[in-house]
Amino acid sequence: MRRDDAAPVGWAVSTQPVPYPAAVAAMEARAAAIADGTAGELIWLLEHPPLYTAGVSAKAGDLIQPDRFPVFESGRGGQFTYHGPGQRVAYVMLDLTQRGRDVRAFVAALEAWIIDALAAFNVTGELREGRVGVWVERKGAGWSREDKIAAIGVKLRRWVSFHGISLNVEPDLSHFSGIVPCGQTEHGVTSLVDLGLPVTLDDADAALRASFSKVFGPVEDAEAPV
């Protein structure tokens, strides 16, 4: 999923939590500028304050505790998800007219990016038919289960993507109990720290950056939109 011209993608990191409405406004403005040819592609890494977002397929019954955190309609694909401190959100603003107008290939590239980044910590990320995102199989004495470690939800406008992925590094996993995450009632959520790994957001950022370059091409430091 690389550009033919190998132009680098901007890589920006916000060091303070960004309110969701401000992030969406900045994303939409940047995506429009990319489509107009007045701005370059951008990957924007950030955290949000605790909140829930509803994708276009969200079901009202999956919002179990509507008063727990603010709830936002997102317009992205998918259902309900949680964002909050300790979770690395990466908003992906890429021009698919330069990379191939193939939505399936784009989502597969996002999955490959996450899986390769997890491998840096010796975590095997897996895909499951009919379940969006990246999963980790966990086994113990006489038991096994599959927990979600990363979510994917994107939107395209004029063939420019926005929204993106979220990777659970060290969020408060109890915050997911206010929703049915991504409509999955039979499976849980996990994080790198929950798996027993002493991983920081900086560690995750380094792995995500290295893996992105493998899948999508080179990056260069950029200023965060907010």
Swiss-Prot record:
Can you tell me which residues bind substrate? R76, G77, G78, Q79, F80, T81, Y82, H83, A151, I152, G153, G164, I165, S166
A Gene Ontology molecular function term of the record: lipoyl(octanoyl) transferase activity
| Annotated catalytic residues | C182
Indicate the enzyme's highest-level EC class.
Answer: transferase
What CDD domains does UniProt report for this protein, alphabetically?
A: LipB
Q: Name one GO biological process term.
A: protein modification process
* Any Gene Ontology CC annotation: cytoplasm
Name the PROSITE patterns on file. BPL_LPL_CATALYTIC (PS51733), LIPB (PS01313)
The biological pathway it contributes to is:
Protein modification; protein lipoylation via endogenous pathway; protein N(6)-(lipoyl)lysine from octanoyl-[acyl-carrier-protein]: step 1/2
Please indicate which residues carry the site annotation Lowers pKa of active site Cys: K148
Q: Work out whether the entry's keyword set contains Cytoplasm.
A: yes
User: Mostly located where?
Assistant: cytoplasm
Where found, per UniProt?
Answer: Cytoplasm
| Other remarks on this protein | In the reaction, the free carboxyl group of octanoic acid is attached via an amide linkage to the epsilon-amino group of a specific lysine residue of lipoyl domains of lipoate-dependent enzymes.
Role summary: Catalyzes the transfer of endogenously produced octanoic acid from octanoyl-acyl-carrier-protein onto the lipoyl domains of lipoate-dependent enzymes. Lipoyl-ACP can also act as a substrate although octanoyl-ACP is likely to be the physiological substrate.
Q: Which family does it belong to?
A: Belongs to the LipB family.
Q: What protein name applies here?
A: Octanoyltransferase
What is the species of this protein?
Caulobacter vibrioides (strain ATCC 19089 / CIP 103742 / CB 15)
Upper lineage:
Bacteria, Pseudomonadati, Pseudomonadota, Alphaproteobacteria, Caulobacterales
